[in-house]
């Protein structure tokens, strides 16, 4: 079941919302949300409901054991993390790993045909964060299994995030207020997210698919950029739209999830981009991988290695194929570049800000257009289609304007020629 389906909008959501509103007491409300979340998941994946419940039960028990057996807690949390990662490997990466082994060593191991459970990357990361936080003492182990299961399976953030930490919603699971103002804000936010998904992302996606489906040799520079920018904004409005809907649904039921996107295309570096894009995932890797590896406390070389490892894992998390692996490496390389080259760390004026926005968008754009094409060597060579000299101003204006919601009129100030040309390209720049 997806948020934009008629079943969800016209049947599921009204019933769950009304039931949650009229039921007295937090226990009844939680039971309603838990039942609804399991039905929501079972609608598309009835078999894998058992898998999700089993995962929640195992992590619930691990957390209790960590709290009870303090002298053995390091071993317990290690086993918990290994089992959670094994769950991902089996259901998400088994086919990819088998194919890779067969290709590299000429073996003929049968490739397992395992259907990927919806949301497994999200609920597994949430479960791991819960157990690790109990180990660290960030929160106590929850004695009530139903509350842990509700935290892991809560339907608004189950499919596409944001990834929620237990201590961020613990108090709201225990007691929360469903106010008229919160419901109104939630409905507005949900509608905004639904509009992003249906009215913008889907249209951008059709444009990108049509253009990327054409032979690369038949595309001119302008058309190639239209395809790249369309896909760039398709994934943003799709993913941020789902996050908006999840946050809005949370408000409607009295929960407050953290923001997951913060105008990422206004970033002036790849480092800043990842502070604004899929914030819950970036913060998860920061807290549970980057900092334990040493963070930036052991010199630049070690910092770069740590960042590279994190983005290698980020790429693998996004998908089980070589394309996502190289996509993670690609971003990791630019993060290392920004760490070593002083130019990226120095403050600058408006001109440098505009240049850095263009640089960031070029890097991100080239990365996503290659990800759009499932095989890396068939990626559309967008950046190789250098526009004619007379077109530089046009592309500058598109990129500077797409960099964020506010650029202070910089494109108009830099050159009358650039601004005059902008009017001519708005048809494919917006």
Language-model features: where?
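Membrane-embedded transmembrane alpha-helical bundles that form the catalytic cores
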Residues: 1-402, 406-407, 411-430
């Amino acid at each position: 079941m997806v948020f934009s389906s008629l079943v969800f909008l016209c049947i599921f959501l009204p019933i769950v919302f009304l039931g949650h509103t009229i039921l007295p007491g937090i226990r009844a409300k939680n039971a309603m949300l838990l039942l609804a979340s399991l039905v929501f998941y079972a609608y598309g994946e009835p078999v894998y409901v058992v898998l999700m419940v089993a995962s929640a039960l195992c992590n619930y028990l691990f957390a209790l054991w960590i709290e009870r057996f303090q002298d053995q807690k390091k071993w317990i949390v290690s086993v918990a993390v290994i089992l959670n990662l094994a769950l991902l490997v089996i259901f998400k990466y088994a086919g990819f790993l088998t194919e890779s082994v067969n290709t590299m060593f000429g073996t003929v191991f049968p490739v397992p045909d395992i259907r990927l459970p919806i949301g497994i990357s999200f609920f597994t990361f949430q479960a791991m964060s819960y157990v690790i936080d109990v180990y660290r003492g960030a929160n106590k182990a929850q004695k009530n299994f139903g509350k842990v299961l509700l935290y892991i399976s809560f339907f608004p953030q189950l499919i596409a995030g944001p990834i929620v930490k237990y201590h961020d919603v613990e108090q709201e699971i225990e007691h929360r207020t469903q106010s008229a103002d919160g419901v109104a804000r939630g409905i507005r936010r949900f509608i905004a997210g639904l509009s992003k998904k249906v009215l913008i992302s889907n249209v951008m996606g059709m444009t990108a698919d049509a253009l990327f489906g054409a032979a690369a040799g038949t595309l001119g520079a302008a058309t190639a950029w239209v395809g790249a920018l369309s896909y760039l904004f398709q994934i943003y409005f799709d993913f941020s739209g789902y996050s908006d809907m999840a946050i809005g649904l949370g408000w409607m039921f009295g929960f407050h999830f953290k923001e997951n996107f913060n105008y990422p295309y206004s970033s002036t570096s790849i480092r800043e981009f990842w502070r604004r894009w899929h914030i819950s995932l970036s913060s998860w890797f920061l807290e549970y991988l980057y900092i334990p590896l040493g963070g930036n406390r052991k010199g630049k070389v070690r910092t770069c290695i740590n960042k590279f490892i994190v983005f290698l894992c980020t790429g693998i998390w996004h998908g089980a194929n070589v394309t996502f692996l190289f996509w993670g490496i690609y971003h990791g390389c630019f993060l290392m570049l920004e760490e070593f080259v002083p130019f990226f760390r120095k403050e600058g004026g408006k001109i440098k800000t505009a240049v850095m926005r263009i640089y960031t968008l070029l890097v991100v754009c080239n990365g996503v257009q290659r990800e759009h094409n499932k095989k890396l060597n068939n990626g559309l060579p967008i950046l190789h289609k250098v526009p004619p000299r007379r077109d530089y101003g046009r592309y500058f204006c598109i990129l500077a304007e797409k960099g964020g919601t506010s650029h202070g009129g910089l494109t108009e100030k830099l050159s009358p020629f650039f601004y005059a040309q902008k009017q001519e390209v708005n048809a494919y720049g917006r």
